[in-house]
UniProtKB/Swiss-Prot annotation:
Protein name according to UniProt: Laminin subunit gamma-1
Residue stretches making up the Laminin IV type A domain: 512-687
Coiled-coil region: 1034-1594
Annotated GO CC locations: basement membrane; collagen-containing extracellular matrix; extracellular region; laminin-10 complex; neuromuscular junction; protein complex involved in cell-matrix adhesion; synaptic cleft
Any one GO molecular function term: extracellular matrix structural constituent
Subunit architecture: Laminin is a complex glycoprotein, consisting of three different polypeptide chains (alpha, beta, gamma), which are bound to each other by disulfide bonds into a cross-shaped molecule comprising one long and three short arms with globules at each end.
Subcellular location: Secreted, Extracellular space, Extracellular matrix, Basement membrane
GO annotation, biological process: cell adhesion; cell migration; chromatin organization; extracellular matrix disassembly; gene expression; hair cell differentiation; hair follicle cell proliferation; hair follicle morphogenesis
Cited function: Binding to cells via a high affinity receptor, laminin is thought to mediate the attachment, migration and organization of cells into tissues during embryonic development by interacting with other extracellular matrix components.
Domain of life from the UniProt record: Eukaryota
Chain positions with Phosphoserine modification: S1147, S1491
InterPro entries: EGF-like_dom (IPR000742), Laminin/Netrin_ECM (IPR050440), Laminin_IV (IPR000034), Laminin_N (IPR008211), LE_dom (IPR002049), LMN_ATRN_NET-like_EGF (IPR056863)
Amino acid sequence: MTGGGRAALALQPRGRLWPLLAVLAAVAGCVRAAMDECADEGGRPQRCMPEFVNAAFNVTVVATNTCGTPPEEYCVQTGVTGVTKSCHLCDAGQQHLQHGAAFLTDYNNQADTTWWQSQTMLAGVQYPNSINLTLHLGKAFDITYVRLKFHTSRPESFAIYKRTREDGPWIPYQYYSGSCENTYSKANRGFIRTGGDEQQALCTDEFSDISPLTGGNVAFSTLEGRPSAYNFDNSPVLQEWVTATDIRVTLNRLNTFGDEVFNEPKVLKSYYYAISDFAVGGRCKCNGHASECVKNEFDKLMCNCKHNTYGVDCEKCLPFFNDRPWRRATAESASESLPCDCNGRSQECYFDPELYRSTGHGGHCTNCRDNTDGAKCERCRENFFRLGNTEACSPCHCSPVGSLSTQCDSYGRCSCKPGVMGDKCDRCQPGFHSLTEAGCRPCSCDLRGSTDECNVETGRCVCKDNVEGFNCERCKPGFFNLESSNPKGCTPCFCFGHSSVCTNAVGYSVYDISSTFQIDEDGWRVEQRDGSEASLEWSSDRQDIAVISDSYFPRYFIAPVKFLGNQVLSYGQNLSFSFRVDRRDTRLSAEDLVLEGAGLRVSVPLIAQGNSYPSETTVKYIFRLHEATDYPWRPALSPFEFQKLLNNLTSIKIRGTYSERTAGYLDDVTLQSARPGPGVPATWVESCTCPVGYGGQFCETCLPGYRRETPSLGPYSPCVLCTCNGHSETCDPETGVCDCRDNTAGPHCEKCSDGYYGDSTLGTSSDCQPCPCPGGSSCAIVPKTKEVVCTHCPTGTAGKRCELCDDGYFGDPLGSNGPVRLCRPCQCNDNIDPNAVGNCNRLTGECLKCIYNTAGFYCDRCKEGFFGNPLAPNPADKCKACACNPYGTVQQQSSCNPVTGQCQCLPHVSGRDCGTCDPGYYNLQSGQGCERCDCHALGSTNGQCDIRTGQCECQPGITGQHCERCETNHFGFGPEGCKPCDCHHEGSLSLQCKDDGRCECREGFVGNRCDQCEENYFYNRSWPGCQECPACYRLVKDKAAEHRVKLQELESLIANLGTGDDMVTDQAFEDRLKEAEREVTDLLREAQEVKDVDQNLMDRLQRVNSSLHSQISRLQNIRNTIEETGILAERARSRVESTEQLIEIASRELEKAKMAAANVSITQPESTGEPNNMTLLAEEARRLAERHKQEADDIVRVAKTANETSAEAYNLLLRTLAGENQTALEIEELNRKYEQAKNISQDLEKQAARVHEEAKRAGDKAVEIYASVAQLTPVDSEALENEANKIKKEAADLDRLIDQKLKDYEDLREDMRGKEHEVKNLLEKGKAEQQTADQLLARADAAKALAEEAAKKGRSTLQEANDILNNLKDFDRRVNDNKTAAEEALRRIPAINRTIAEANEKTREAQLALGNAAADATEAKNKAHEAERIASAVQKNATSTKADAERTFGEVTDLDNEVNGMLRQLEEAENELKRKQDDADQDMMMAGMASQAAQEAELNARKAKNSVSSLLSQLNNLLDQLGQLDTVDLNKLNEIEGSLNKAKDEMKASDLDRKVSDLESEARKQEAAIMDYNRDIAEIIKDIHNLEDIKKTLPTGCFNTPSIEKP
């Protein structure tokens, strides 16, 4: 059974509670099924609730008082006077004796009852001291009942409070008291009338009887007595009333039999609070929008919300469900939150009350997408437009300067001012600048040097690359010849790189180098791509030359010599020719026109520079010889490199064939140049201003006395002065080599010839003399001593005459110290620095410079203070430092065992380096060994101590270095440590107790802790300590002793009361009792009559009230800062506390007076039965006095509550006004009012002092004062609270206004964020479009290069490219073509196999050519896979396809460049290695043969050339169409993709992949052979260079030379 179920069974309601709970139970049974689900069977929302539970079950209750700490005795109340009570021990430290708060909410087992218990009345548990039991539910619950089961008698007075939020105030729920009016100022068993305040707490004495003594129940129903309980769904007041997050039970007063007044300890121990069960029945509050509560990630309870709500209690609508206000679900309506209608353009909205009132829909959309606006995002924002109702709104972006209006038309076009253009009127028209309110002004640019455009802001012209000036009217430094036809504007100075200053040369005219073929072929010839000759045909009829191709490989027209050589004067000019083909089946390449020279090579496709495709009609092609990007020569060269190429032009190649078995016809070839002489001026020829040492028009020669600094560079080399050191007057102007004499040598006569020594740089004929060395070996002169020494001694020897061992060697080569010993290397076990000098003794071989911490004759041991293996190969594994700890080592030795490294340790010291003490020892720093810790066996925790101080680790409360004694103010030394004495600082003579824990008390104090006053002593706050009561109280003490004796007799009589058979009647006793009642009644009447006696005090209080009202009216316009008002409030609070202390003193004096009155002697009758009757009379009088005291206490409580309420209202007012501006006048006025209040407060203190004195004289006067003070409360608290609420309301309105402004700001910010995002997108789109435009020509060229490469690489690549185009343009027709092409490829596989076999037979003889063919085949397959990948990607992302295509084009171009680079490297190797010329020629011949043999393998590739013209145009269209694939028929595309996959499967079935793989394998073998060949060439070149360097360093004669290995 759950906790909630047990609680329900345990609750037995009675009285009015039972009918209401019965009704609620019936209703719950009817709707149980409905409450479980938040939607009915049809999916319609309905009210749902979590299950009914005991919310308190196993929830921790916080109790402010619990017995057992320290252990204490309590007695069970029997209710029979005189009977010996059963006493027990409450000890929180023992499980079976503890009664903690956890027992309040555990399982309530009737057979084994557990309960919470407070301390007894002996410990001060009684009114006015209260105990709070606080239950934190964790979240809001709808509370049905609160039930308490008491283990002792129910309290006389207790209250139940609740909080509706965890940080909110405590609200009274219900009061239970036998004195409702006096204790809680509530009417007993009051009720709520219809229309009354249904959130008020009631009070009843129904459960305040002292019986039963155990097991009494108190059940509080939250809806009992509430008129609207049966209309709960429509009562927000009761919905708030049953809501609680916390429940608090405040126990105010115990129920007693009255015998506690005699302070008998055993009696006091029998009075205490004890509760066995604390149950709270209810449901997790979810407002009808959830059927369960769950724990979140923070282990907090919250509702599992439905109906589009959220929040801990489902108290809010989800962010997008604000179409109507949130409501609590009812039985009639689920009140689910409805979504906002934003037309699909927003996911955010808020509830707009005004919109809801006007339209019935309150969802106001925010952050509308697509630049829309309106409550439902139904219209475009201002200055936006859209073409259709379903389209997104686009910003007009009309320029505020260039447009006539910021609003555009329905197409987004703005109205522009004069000279302004663009849809947005944001830029000047071409040729205009300086956009202003009046429009744009025209530019004034020099058309020769500008693009006819100028800066739209400043009017500064946009110059060509090599032009400068505001109007682009002059060339930049280093450039000349400003002309409009030059895309760069000016031509860079060439001058062979020696000068950057040049001008237009005078005397040059235009000259055309041409071939018209009127007589013959004019020296032109034809080559194949591999360089082999091919036939050329000259037609006398057509007067042109032709070439016919019988294979796929292209053939080139080769220009004659007159077009070659120094053609630098053609830089920037045109090369033109007329060309046609016999059929349009053409496939272009990136090398249709090739220029070579000076080690450089450039090429362009035939259609570059705006030329058209070749056709049957003769077309004139014009190519500008310039490096600008407008003329895409590849690779790109710098201006200097391009002119360098033309300065030594070695080859012009024009491609003649573009497909298999086609012919190409060439005519009218013209190269524009210049020459000296009359004619049309050639302004592009330069005349350089040369620096010193240079001559010639172009600075191409060195003047006399100068030479080339780098002869191999020719005219490009700088000119420097000849350097011959005085041994020659002439030098070669090109190489700079001097014609030396006087036994000198070197290019500059900078050294003596072999066998001679001296300084040839002195410039005399006797600079070089013969060497004095035997055998004529080379020698040198020591600069300082001028001594001649030999320079080529044998290895290991040294000295002026090679008579000594060299450094690093030892021996006696001349036998000067004994027998002859040859020089040998030093033997030091690799423990020396090979780069050091003097590692060993040159005579004995003793090692002198051992490293790695080694020593010994051969560095074969570790030196002192180190250990390890000196012969280890790794230096890190050799000798390491001992690093002995000087404090733990015998005599502080630094040495150790040379092998193990163990140091010699002192006693009780351990570790290799003697750095630690043995366990249980310390003080290593003493240097005498470690000392024993000697920790006390009981006082220490583990016997260990601090290794430095020796301090042991002690048990709690124990101290001393060895843990041998208790700490100060502790006792009980033992294994668990020492316990604190805890002596009271005022009552004990010393804070140190005795061995048994008892403290020595001062006079008047008693108790183990000296924390209680002795009998007939009292505690005085103003004078700390227990003071003896006045002498008159001794009589009271004596009387108390007498009464104790009488009380014992009375208890004895009561115990024997039931043993007699007859009842005793005593008329005298009854009369006396009535007289006592009359006296007490008169006393009460007099106390009530004197309430209005002190009119002076009431007048003062009235003035205080008036003053406070005046302050309230002034404070409505005052706004204080928190700091100032906090100081004032603190001072007022101090005054209130002082007044409370005075009232408390008066209360104690009243208590003393009451006790004295209770002890007044009453004359006893002489009758035998009278003693018993008189005792009863005294008891009755005591009860009356107790009741009067209770009334006085109630008056005090009311006064105190009024004071606190006034202080709270005042503080609330101050907090409400915090943060506002405050003027100096208002501060002064407030200070004045405060001084008045302070004076009044001082008067109140004086009045309270007077009350104190009167209370000492008579208790009745104290009652009068308390009653007067109680009348202060209603006036001040209500007025202050009303004013505070008014100002609080104003602050709340201001907060709502601020929230609205913040919301508007957030809306504006989100709107601007959307605009920013749109602007960024437009900028990115503009950049992308600009890049696309900039790269358009490059893409076209790349497309052409791809087409030519596809034709060259094989039929499969072109077929895949055609598949892509067919899939995009003509799906149905292209499917059949794909299938036919695949079958064609299958039929040609045998021809490929035959070609592979023939190529394999000639592999060794034609490595280069076959390697190229294999590479082509590999690339063919790669391109096929690449095309397949691109086709797949096009279906997903058109932009990715374009990027892949561009990257593929770049890879093809790079591949061609790499092949060309390899060819150039081979040519260089052939030039440098003349002895292999014949082999190279043979290789070229074999390559030609291999090419012939490989033609059959490439027949399929040539067939693909038939459709090259249409392919090129289609590819150009493809670039435009790839960005417009939004309307592609995906179904059709998927169908075509299936057909394509089917065709691929058929190709795979033909085993083409395996055959291509075999070809790839063979290609890899050939590539490896080529790489080996290249490596051999590189090594040979290095060897040659090495030999040349050696030759330069050798003297003319050598008498002791080692053999040189030949390359």
